[in-house]
Swiss-Prot record:
Record-level GO BP terms: proteolysis
Keywords of the record: Carboxypeptidase, Disulfide bond, Glycoprotein, Hydrolase, Protease, Secreted, Signal
An MF annotation (GO) of this entry: serine-type carboxypeptidase activity
Full protein name: Serine carboxypeptidase-like 29
Glycosylated residues in this chain: 47, 144, 293
Designated gene of the protein: SCPL29
Species for this entry: Arabidopsis thaliana
């Protein structure tokens, strides 16, 4: 559980001032970008061909809010490749912990919590990848104003993330005007369209300081509370995880509830459902749970992913290894986290942030309509083994958008095998990934990389669409 840092805010403020002053004095010798360059990480027993940078960008100097980032340049042709911002959700979960260390980043962590290995399916093979821990209180991101940690919400997260991007690109001016995309998962289903909307509005009022946003992609993301609940209850019932009675009660008591702020009555039914489901990994229902962790009961009530990993040797306890690694003082030093600014205990998710989340609209579907009209490339993908924001939830939400289909629904292929299913709509592309859980790149890394490459290039995944379309036409003609 992440600790609140309010008790030592004065000390942190003084450290932050000293830290920034030192950085200013070093400006004559090294730019802030050069100071942020990471030379080598503890436990990295191999060389890499790409540069990477990490550090802080202040989003509110008066209150002392600063967000932590980690940039990985593309393996090849970094100067011509697009920039992609990756966001995890929660709310309150770290993009470094999940996105970088478990999913799409190049550096993954072995079971000893000290040694790194290179992810052969890292997304920086195709783009420059920027991980951001937002809002403050998540990961290494901090505020010197203790009340900030209990006043986060969707609105301020979007505002601070936009401020971060505008200031970050001044530090890395080579990315000004570069094609820019936002990708992420889970509660980032709120963050991503909200930040995209903020960027579009900013661009409309600023010619000189615009961000060249081309599109976004959301995986297993919250989109609409009603449809997310509807699809979730249907999914866990259809797989036989809950009883008919509990299914009926969930629909009755929770069907119109907020996804992250449920009523006491709804929570009681969710507790019953959790007991019936048992100790499985609801983020990946067909893989083993981590028995080394505490009981995973009440998973439907928790915001923090208790995830599992498929790698060369299956290890469902990845979160534990990540927590050990990013608490190491030598790791924090390598990532330019001053001792006085580091959390007393770094954690993958912050309970303080999630439990005090202030604003969360019941739906972001209206933003989808706005951004489709703005001409952004929008893809939505879903791992079909996720029982937190399942594929049924996503399909209900997309159906509610009432978009015109442009292609038949059918399988896409990778190496001759079905990778999942897809359908293109006017303004949106929907893709499922077969066998993947809530964190698609974790369980199906090869398929996820193929999906990502297709998205940023704007090319469809390999399908047998023509034969499917022909079959559908024949059926319509026969009827």
């Amino acid at each position: 559980m992440a600790k609140t840092r309010g008790s030592c805010c004065l000390v942190n403020a003084l450290i932050a001032i000293a830290f920034l002053a030192t950085a200013h004095l070093c400006e004559a010798g090294l730019s802030q970008k050069e100071q942020d360059k990471v030379s080598k990480l503890p436990g990295q027993n191999f060389n890499v061909s790409f540069a990477h940078y990490s550090g802080f960008v202040a989003t509110n100097e008066q209150l002392g809010r600063a967000l932590f980032y980690w940039l990985f340049e593309a393996v090849e042709d970094a100067k011509s490749k697009p920039l992609v911002l990756w966001l995890n959700g929660g709310p309150g979960c770290s993009s470094v912990a999940y996105g970088e260390a478990e999913e799409i980043g190049p550096f993954h962590i072995k079971a000893d919590g000290k040694t790194l290995y290179l992810n052969q399916y890292s997304w920086n093979q195709a783009a420059n990848i920027l991980f951001l821990d937002a809002p403050v209180g998540v990961g290494y991101s901090y505020s010197n104003t203790s009340s900030d940690l209990k006043s986060n919400g969707d609105k301020r997260t979007a505002e601070d993330s936009l401020k971060f991007l505008l200031k970050w690109v001044e530090r890395f001016p080579e990315y000004k005007g570069r094609d820019f995309y936002i990708v992420g998962e889970s509660y980032a289903g709120h963050y991503i369209p909200q930040l995209s909307e903020a960027i579009v509005k900013h661009n409309q009022g600023s010619d000189k300081n615009s961000i060249n946003l081309k599109g976004y992609m959301v995986g297993n993301g919250l989109m609409d509370d009603f449809h997310d609940r509807l699809g979730l209850f249907q999914y866990i019932w259809s797989l036989g995880f809950i009883s008919d009675q509990t299914y009926s009660l969930l629909q009755l008591q929770c069907g119109f509830e907020s996804f992250i702020h449920s009523s006491k009555q709804c929570n009681k039914i969710l507790e019953i459902a959790d007991k019936e489901i048992g100790n499985i990994d609801q983020y990946s229902v067909f893989t083993p749970a981590c028995v080394a962790n505490a009981s995973q009961s009440n998973m439907l009530l928790k915001k923090r992913p208790m995830t599992s990993r498929v790698s060369e040797q299956y290890d469902p306890c990845t979160e534990k290894h990540t927590t050990v690694y990013f608490n190491l003082p030598e790791v924090q030093k390598a990532l330019h986290v001053p001792p006085g600014l580091a959390p007393s205990k770094w954690d993958t998710c912050s309970d303080v942030v999630s439990e005090h989340w202030n604003d969360s609209p019941s739906s972001v579907l209206n933003i989808y309509h706005e951004l489709i009209a703005a001409g952004l490339r929008i893809w939505v993908f879903s791992g079909d083994a996720d029982a937190v924001v399942p594929v049924t939830s996503t399909r209900y939400s997309i159906d509610a958008l009432n978009l015109r289909p442009l292609s038949a629904y059918g399988p896409w292929y990778l190496d001759g095998q079905v990778g999942g299913w897809s359908q293109q709509y006017a303004g949106l592309n929907f893709v499922t990934v077969r066998g993947a859980g809530h964190e698609v790149p974790l369980h199906r890394p090869k398929q996820a990389l193929a999906l990502f490459k297709a998205f940023i290039s704007g090319t469809p995944l390999s399908t047998h669409e023509n034969s499917i379309s022909r079959d559908m036409s024949e059926l319509v003609s026969d009827s």
